[in-house]
Amino acid sequence: MRPGLHAAAVAVLALTVLPVGCGPKTPDYQSIWTRTTTTPTTTEAPVPFAQYLKDSGVSGEPVAPDKLTDLTVSIPTPPGWEKVDKPNIAPTTETIAKAGKLPTAMLMVFKLDGDFDAADLVKHGNADATLAENFRLLDQSGANFHGFPSSMIEGSYDLNGQRLHTYNRIVIPTGSAPDRQRYLVQLAVTSLAEQAAPDAADIQAIIHGFTVAAK
């Protein structure tokens, strides 16, 4: 089992660096600041995504988005944002930030190996967000993204004394023939909840400009 895939699956919220067919709806920013916990209705306790991957025998090799030969994966860089390199972030992860701090966007790609149902896998992609401290759900979707199985969740949570707003999308695309390799692509955008409204234009530009397509 390659550790990179499972470590990254749980790292996005912890690092705070961190369409949609119809595009995400405008968040209710007032509700972002509240700490009243809300979680999606479910009959079972959420299984952390990393645990689900491990239990399903799925392994993955990290690949830099710009090194893919059979898939196009990219996000735009809004004015005032720049690429960020940090020792605690894998070099294969593309990270951009505004003025070198929050808000941030993190883009990760993994080449997958294992026998799994992509449509079922993405159903577990939102679990980690719902398990965050005082998580409040704003929006979620299980609709395909550019024709590929996908899940999206948006909400706010507490971390290290701060209230954060997060948008997280997981996509399981298939590369072009002949290999038709399957990948896990994750985009996470994180901002301070109190700055979510002022930063909305930049964040929406990243979300709407997120591209996943076979070459």
Where are these regions (language model features)?
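N-terminal targeting sequences that direct proteins away from the cytosol to non-cytosolic compartments
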Residues: 1-92, 179, 190-215
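Extracytoplasmic
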Residues: 68-72, 100-104, 148-150
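Extracytoplasmic/periplasmic mature domains of Sec-exported, cell-envelope-associated bacterial proteins
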Residues: 87, 91, 104, 163-165
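A short acidic-to-branched-hydrophobic micro-motif
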Residues: 93-122
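Active-site-flanking beta-strand signature of metal-NTP-handling nucleotidyl enzymes
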Residues: 106, 185-187
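Solvent-exposed loop/turn segments at secondary-structure junctions
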Residues: 113-114, 157-160, 191-195
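Signature of long, low-cysteine stretches enriched in small and polar/charged residues
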Residues: 126-174, 178
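Short hydrophobic/glycine-rich mini-motifs in sensory/regulatory modules
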Residues: 178-185
